[in-house]
Design a protein with these regions (language model features):
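Conserved hydrophobic beta-strand within the GNAT/NAT acetyltransferase core sheet
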Residues: 88, 122-126
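Short glycine/proline-centered loop/turn elements that form peptide/ligand docking sites
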Residues: 107, 130-133, 150-155
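Conserved catalytic-core motifs of GNAT/GCN5-like acyltransferases
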Residues: 125-126, 138, 143-160
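Noncatalytic regulatory segments and standalone regulatory/sensor domains
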Residues: 169, 305-306, 316-318, 322-328, ...
Length: 401
């Protein structure tokens, strides 16, 4: 529990008799936090409801600095189940108390809160025209890794910054091609969205990300039924869709049994899923895709990434979303301890793309989540450009076998 009196050497620009406290934010602080929002921001202000949710129900930590009983600044840090990623969700200092080291102290406290939850990255967004904040972050060791266009209500861009917190491994994930991010637009298109990201990384000039391709890939690879509602996509259908577009693809799965069959109860639905699956298997025979009856460890995936392949992996969503549904993600990089993952699902309004990109997940944790259902189904695709494409650019064969 954070409850620290600020040391004398950190009291720059403050009256000598001021009492300064850094502590956890509480619901009773919400009126003061709303007043700071009003004074700091012309648009995109947090509401009372948002503050209450973030301080009481969300997977988040609120921090405030208090001067002689008055809240003068705050930081909100959100965390993401199943990952080692934190986000500086919101951060503000009352204009009348700037230049006193408040922002620097709150930022350091936010980083410590992230470390205490075993997070290795803290990410944030900042307005491109907020020069003072950008200077603060860069002096604190943050690096820019992207831009959101038209992000704020007034259409200003947001710079995306991140800082690595204390992990002794490589300073950046080791990976092959740079994988762009695409957010799924329908509940049942995680598989197509994951496949789109991988294909775009390998053949950027040939693949155009958008809903037309997302829905087309779903039509080509859906199991028709799965759990409830529209069917999702299985490994065999996704592999066929990739092979049709000229990619080399390996399917790593224990056997050729119909996947997700235990997710439906109706015998009629089960029969339809079997017919669809048998048709996929027939088409695979002449597609160039390879079925390998084995499963990949997290280290196998890391090795494949280092060799230029892109793994698309089936996981159970429970460890991230606390709901049991099958979900596809893309492995974008690896280091000695973590796999880094693009998750196409942005779950609710309190999350953004930045929360789902290159999510660091400990390898042991990833192996536990990379299985689904009572049958503990494990499935992964390794996607590469065709052999002729790799030979032309001198790339190495990235086989994980």
């Amino acid at each position: 529990m954070l409850d620290n009196t600020v040391s004398s050497d950190s009291r720059q620009g403050l009256p000598g008799d001021a009492t300064i406290l850094l502590r956890q934010a509480q619901p009773a602080d919400i009126p003061a936090l709303l007043a700071i929002e009003e004074r700091c921001f012309a648009t995109d202000r947090l509401t009372r409801r948002s503050f209450h949710y973030l301080l009481t129900k969300a997977k988040a930590t609120g921090l405030v600095e208090v001067h002689s009983g008055t809240v003068v600044g705050y930081a909100l840090v959100s965390f993401h189940s199943g990952t080692s990623l934190a986000r500086l969700y919101s951060f503000a200092v009352d204009p009348g108390h700037r230049g006193q080291g408040v922002a620097k102290r709150l930022l350091a406290a936010a980083e410590q809160a992230a470390r205490s939850r075993d997070c290795i990255y803290l990410r944030l967004e900042v307005r491109r025209d907020n020069a003072a904040a950008i200077d603060l972050y860069k002096k604190a060791g943050y690096r820019e890794f992207g831009v959101y266009t038209d992000y704020y209500e007034d259409h200003m861009e947001a710079l995306r910054l991140e800082k690595r917190l204390g992990h002794s491994g490589p300073s950046a994930p080791l990976g092959g091609p740079l994988v762009p991010y695409y957010q799924q637009t329908l509940d049942f298109t995680c598989g197509p969205s994951a496949l789109m990201m991988a294909m775009k990384a390998l053949k950027p000039a040939e693949i155009e990300l958008g809903r037309k391709l997302e829905i087309r890939l779903w039509r080509e690879s859906t199991t028709v039924f799965m759990t409830s509602g529209h069917g999702g996509c299985g490994p065999f259908g996704l592999a066929l869709a990739a092979a049709r577009r000229g990619f080399a693809v390996d399917i790593h799965i224990k056997d050729n049994a119909t996947p997700f069959l235990d997710s439906v109860r109706s015998d009629e639905k089960k029969e339809v899923m079997r017919i669809v699956h048998e048709d996929f298997l027939d088409e695979l025979e002449g597609s160039g895709a390879t079925v390998r009856h084995n499963t990949l460890s997290a280290q196998d995936m890391a090795d494949a990434v280092a060799g230029g392949a892109i793994p698309i992996v089936l996981i159970s969503s429970y460890r991230i979303y606390h709901e049991k549904f099958p979900h596809w993600v893309v492995v974008t990089g690896a280091d000695d301890r973590f796999l880094y993952v693009h998750d196409p699902l942005v779950y609710d309004r309190h999350h953004a793309h930045i929360d789902r990109m290159n999510m660091p997940i400990p390898k042991a944790d990833f192996e536990r989540m990379a299985r689904y259902g009572k049958a503990q189904l494990k499935a992964a695709l390794l996607l590469r450009p065709q052999l002729s494409d790799r030979a032309a650019d001198g790339s190495a064969d990235g086989s994980a076998d």
